[in-house]
């Protein structure tokens, strides 16, 4: 079915540990990113646990920032770090914050802070806030002279910088998808049916994992 970009395709859910693809479930291209995501994650986590794996830290983009998904993640992972979607109800609290700490991360200067928020009724989490002055000088209607990005977490011990740096490592995992698209045919799936294409996704992911394991053994 058509994706949000209006071409035919699929929207697989993919789990990655380190540099290895450890879980794949497929869905039609026009499904919302949160559609049955809780169920997909539950199956991923249960398979890990059946194989003796314990998840210490889980990170995901804003597509996972919903109450039922976060509840499921908390059952299986000690800590989570999820990009929080924009919430206008929090703007007043964020704008009133004092004590911003200036940090340089990857050569870019940011200001960091954190607050406790009741994201969902009766559930408080830590919101780590990262802001950067707009380079174009244009004032945003809601955010003013800064661009704000937030990370929702249940980690109350790590510093704001440590949390931002850990979450930013997620960007490196996007290169895995570049690798799969360019080297293993994920950009153009071979069949017309989801079941066959899911098999293709699984087999090519296994091949890549074997390749990475061999390269690691050879220490190349």
Question: What residues fall within each predicted segment?
Answer:
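Short acidic, glycine/serine/threonine-rich loops at helix termini
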Residues: 1-2, 22-26, 67-73, 91-97
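An anionic, glycine-rich sequence signature occurring as long contiguous blocks
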Residues: 79-182
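Domain-level cores of phosphate- or acyl-group-handling catalytic modules
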Residues: 31-91
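Short amphipathic alpha-helical "interface-anchor" segments enriched in bulky aromatics
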Residues: 160-194, 199, 203, 207-211
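Short, conserved catalytic/metal-binding motifs centered on acidic residues
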Residues: 1, 19, 55-65, 80, ...
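A short, flexible helix-boundary coil/loop motif
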Residues: 210-220
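Electropositive, glycine- and tryptophan-enriched low-complexity nucleic-acid-binding patches
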Residues: 2-51
């Amino acid at each position: 079915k058509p994706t949000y970009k209006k071409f035919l395709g699929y929207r697989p859910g993919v789990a990655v540990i380190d540099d290895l693809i450890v879980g794949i479930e497929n869905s039609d291209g026009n499904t919302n990113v949160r559609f049955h995501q809780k169920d997909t994650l539950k199956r991923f986590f249960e398979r890990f646990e059946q194989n003796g794996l314990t998840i210490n830290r889980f990170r995901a983009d804003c597509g996972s920032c919903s109450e039922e998904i976060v509840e499921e993640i908390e059952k299986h992972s000690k800590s989570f770090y999820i990009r929080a979607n924009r919430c206008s109800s929090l703007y007043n609290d964020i704008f009133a914050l004092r004590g911003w700490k200036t940090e340089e991360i990857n050569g870019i200067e940011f200001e960091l802070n954190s607050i406790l928020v009741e994201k969902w009724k009766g559930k408080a989490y830590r919101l780590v806030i990262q802001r950067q002055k707009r380079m174009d000088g244009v004032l945003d209607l809601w955010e003013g002279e800064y661009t704000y990005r937030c990370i929702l977490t249940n980690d109350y011990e790590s510093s704001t910088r440590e949390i931002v740096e850990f979450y930013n490592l997620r960007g490196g995992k996007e290169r895995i998808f570049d690798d799969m698209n360019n080297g293993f045919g994920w950009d153009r799936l071979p069949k017309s049916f989801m079941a066959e294409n899911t098999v293709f996704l699984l087999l090519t992911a296994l091949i890549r994992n074997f390749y990475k394991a061999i390269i690691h053994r050879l220490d190349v």
